[in-house]
């Protein structure tokens, strides 16, 4: 039972954080989508949906294309282009680094 309370408090904390920072939620959403990690993508989208702001999160994912040094763009296309230019290993290293920098792991694990 204690575990359920800790998880619930963690989700509430993440939702409060998400409310304050849709750019981060959007970036995490895009990073997970680019890597094909749909379970974590759904977790991020679930938080946005629970807050009634899923569309804003999707828009933020596209606005957060600065991860690849671009103002706007499709995450999957950007990831593929980066992998073509620098190699798949480097692209994945950068994607994982960005996931860590944004604290995406906590959002993905919360649901």
Regions found by a protein language model. Give the residues of each.
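Sec-dependent signal peptide recognition
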Residues: 1-8
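Hydrophobic h-region of N-terminal signal peptides that target proteins for export
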Residues: 9-18
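Generic hydrophobic secondary-structure packing signal
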Residues: 14, 24-25, 44
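Immediate post-signal-peptide N-terminus of mature secreted/exported proteins
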Residues: 19-38
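Compact alpha-helical subdomains of small soluble proteins
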Residues: 45-111
């Amino acid at each position: 039972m204690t575990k359920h309370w800790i998880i619930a408090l963690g989700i509430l904390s993440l939702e409060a954080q998400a409310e304050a920072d849709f750019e981060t939620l959007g970036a995490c959403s895009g990073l997970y989508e680019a890597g094909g990690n749909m379970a974590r993508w759904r977790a991020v989208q679930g938080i946005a949906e629970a807050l009634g702001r899923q569309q804003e999160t999707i828009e933020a994912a596209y606005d957060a294309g600065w991860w690849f040094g671009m103002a706007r763009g499709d995450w999957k296309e950007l990831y593929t282009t980066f992998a073509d230019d620098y190699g798949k290993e480097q692209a994945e290293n950068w994607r994982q680094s960005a996931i860590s920098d944004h604290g995406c792991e906590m959002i993905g694990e919360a649901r």
